[in-house]
Amino acid sequence: MSVIQIILIALLVIAVIAGLVFLWRKAPKLEVTIKKTKFVAYAAVQMILVFLAAYGMGITLLFTGAVEGHFGNLAQAYKKYGFSHCFVSSVLDRGIKKSGDYSEEYMDSLKNDLDNVDVEASEKTPNIIFVQLESFFDPTHVKGITLSENPLPNYQKLISECSSGYLSVPCFGAGTCNTEFEVQTGINIDDFGPGEYPYRTIMKSKVCESMAYDLKKLGYSTHAIHNNDGTFYDRNLVFSHLGYETFTSIEYMDGFEETPMGWAKDYILTGEITKALDSTAGTDYVFTISVQGHGDYPSTPMEGYTPEIKVTNFPVAEQQTSFEYYVNQIHEMDKFIGELIQSLSERDEETVLVLYGDHLPTFDFTDEMLTNGDKFQTQYVIWSNFDMDRQEKNIQAYQLSAYVMQRLGISEGYIMKYHQSKQKLPEDEYLKNLKILEYDILYGKKEIYGGETPYEATNLKMGIDDIEITDVYNYNNTVFIEGSSFNDYSCVLINGKEYTTEKVSDRLLRVNGINVKKDDVVVVAQKGDDKVELSRTTFTCLLYTSPSPRDTERS
């Protein structure tokens, strides 16, 4: 937007407001009865004018630099800039804007450059595992605090021995899915509208080049894992557009523990990652999202909870208790990291593990409180069970996957190739070309692919294990359902009606106070706390009564 356009918008906003004030003060005041339809029309016009004024002012403030164009924390932005600006920006200013340089010729030139990118290929095709650690950072980076013991011995050991560095992330305190999006796709969130979550906009309907799609070309099986609701940030919809073949959410896990604040503990992820690796004969790519460190954190001591690690001298006194609770949660996350490393070390398959924090936790940090001086930085580390040279490199979240793949001799996909070959450009040129490439892939004519995207949405399978029904029978005015892979999220529907379901074991469910008849249709569906059905298994009944539960002999 040019300076002249900004001035014209500002003048228009001022003129509209001045006109409304003038009419209100100078127009004749008549005591008449106004028809309801006219009143509604007048009110609608006034609301539209006010909305346009708010939008115009918001755009003016945005482009003049009076307010930020990027919201690292949407909730904090609402507090800082107010509802009108944030709402208008979030609703209307979406997507990646088309550059004046975007053209078929421009993209042909870029495509030619990237097609000639030469990365030293490797004969290794290791399993590749990414673990995104919720709200995870090293608390010793907070200046002045005292800890009764080291909360992250495993992670700090990895940082000192393996390739690692600071990771600049697009969010602070919230917005996990935006760091997640950058890491998987290599796309810069700053190129979208302020406060936008692509998972909830473009990614619900469009496929996008990603690390999963790139590795699928090389024969990898692709898995996503998250120990929280599958519908959170619409991941159950988005992951098929990012190239994943399976997605194991909390609704497909059994036997996990919860934190005092109700989040699943991360130790469950070791077994789920192992299950994904064991599910195929070939190499696997596993993208894992943890949740244990998630806020909110208790502001007062919790009854029955005794922290293992004591924290003193936290710089925000009123958040002292909350931070101590947080430190103890990430201490448990560090234990999970140690267990995962041990498990992967014992496997015969070559494996690379990438660990990183998605953002800092929700505390009133300023840059000055942190030893690294940036609240939009976490850390990453690259571990492997085979020899890799140790490097220290600070990078952006949208550069992480390309960097890891380059270390492994992998160069697939145009965004990955761009990051691997163009980072030495002047920053302005590097980011400008990246934005044009992003626009072409998501919103443009797909010139980089010759006019049509090569990617198709996958038929996403929820969970690794098949949920099966092997038998349904009546016993003592109770319906029993036998099968496999049942858990606390399994619910029974009979002829379309949902019934209260009790899990007896992972192989047996029961519904009290009812009997089934021949040809009744029994469904076991997986539903989370939001009651959205993620998958279902169907069984048509044969009529019989069992003398006892779990008796598979028909009498």
Regions found by a protein language model. Give the residues of each.
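N-terminal secretory/membrane-targeting segments
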Residues: 1-126, 147-166, 201-205, 209, ...
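Generic cytosolic/nucleocytoplasmic N-terminal low-complexity/intrinsically disordered segments
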Residues: 35-37, 544, 552
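Solvent-exposed soluble domains appended to multi-pass membrane proteins
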Residues: 115-126, 133, 138-502, 508, ...
